């Protein structure tokens, strides 16, 4: 298959590199990904401004834009080959429940709804998973499973896959579930001094202003 691969963590993130390596064993993979981390941008696009695209090779394009920009640019006017399916990930951090509304990983996947097969967003629930290689290899199997269905059986769908922190030994199979309502996220802590604000986010990473 011809696969368009993107993400929201950036073109050089561990997750996208791991799944690219795994997918390339049996498929043609074209990477169109953001230049830097774009987590939390949902399906936003760069409106009324130019977008810089850097061609690293025939199968790697780096975009100064959002994850959704990458999806639309890759599908509409960048790649000559017909794309069969769009894969977004592997994101390091879960995208479950209400989180899908602002997830850049899921937002990018939405751009592939008109393709032959439904777009697939993939996330690891842990920022440092036990075995990213296992998740990447299992993701390939799930991509092939999704694309084995007839189009009418899964039309107008977006597949959102989340891996708990598991490896080959602890894997017990897959379960298909609807999107649930997630608990209220932790209240952010804001610490002030004379020079900046420190915002302690729900993720393990602190943000400074």
Question: What role is predicted for each listed range?
Answer:
Residues 124-132, 150-191:
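Active-site rim beta-loop-alpha module in soluble metabolic enzymes
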Residues 3, 14-82:
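A cross-family phosphate/adenosyl-ligand binding-site feature
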Residues 94-103:
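Glycine/threonine-rich flexible loop motifs
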Residues 126-145:
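Short, glycine-/small-residue-rich phosphate/pyrophosphate-handling segment
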Residues 5-12, 99-100:
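Short, glycine-rich nucleotide/cofactor-binding loops
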Residues 102-127:
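Short, acidic/small-residue loops that bind anionic groups at enzyme active sites
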Residues 199-209:
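Single conserved hydrophobic/aromatic residue that forms the stacking wall/gate
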């Amino acid at each position: 298959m011809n696969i368009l691969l993107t993400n929201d963590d950036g073109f050089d993130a561990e997750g996208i590199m791991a799944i690219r390596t795994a997918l390339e064993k049996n498929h043609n993979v074209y990477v169109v990904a953001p230049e830097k981390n774009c987590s939390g941008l949902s399906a936003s696009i760069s409106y009324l401004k130019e977008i810089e695209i850097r061609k690293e090779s025939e199968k790697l394009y780096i975009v100064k834009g959002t994850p959704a920009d990458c999806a639309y640019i890759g599908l509409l006017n960048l790649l000559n080959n017909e794309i069969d399916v769009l894969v977004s990930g592997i994101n390091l951090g879960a995208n479950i429940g209400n989180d899908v509304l602002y997830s850049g990983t899921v937002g990018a996947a939405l751009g592939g709804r008109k393709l032959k097969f439904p777009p697939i967003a993939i996330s690891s629930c842990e920022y440092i998973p036990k075995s990213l290689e296992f998740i990447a290899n299992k993701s390939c199997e799930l991509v092939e499973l999704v694309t084995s269905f007839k189009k009418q059986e899964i039309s107008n769908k977006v597949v959102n896959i989340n891996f708990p922190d598991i490896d080959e030994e602890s894997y017990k199979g897959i379960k298909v579930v609807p999107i649930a309502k997630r608990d209220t996220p932790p209240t952010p802590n804001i610490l002030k001094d004379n020079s900046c604000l420190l915002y302690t986010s729900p993720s393990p990473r602190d943000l400074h202003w």
